[in-house]
């Protein structure tokens, strides 16, 4: 976590059986049947499956060459408020784009203002072809709105399901 710039104690970390279990636990804790969850469109189907299994209505938010379109998410909030937002800011799945710095700031400002939890899927945050990795959203999170999901299964141990969730200690 230190390599991603996340400073936290063990009371803020929950070890899971892969990232998918972390999504499942978040869905069970936050979502009631009929609640809305904002997801990237296109986005990773695994996260969508976990929230759909909890009874969530999935609300797609478009992704472009700068990542999640935060302005679209803000407009969506006026129509139907999601319980949380799921985003992959480092390496968006399936497009591979990274959320721009301006949109990272805008997303966190919106989350703080609206008290809207953001699930950060950092499945491959250390992957880069050139230059340093962008910091995880969780490193910029002042209002404890970000639930950070990571995994070792993709990069280190494909056959071993090992993930983790970093959140405010009260949630863990």
Task: Report the location of each language-model feature.
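Conserved core of the PLP fold type I
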Residues: 1-115, 126-143
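Conserved core segment of the aminotransferase class I/II
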Residues: 139-172
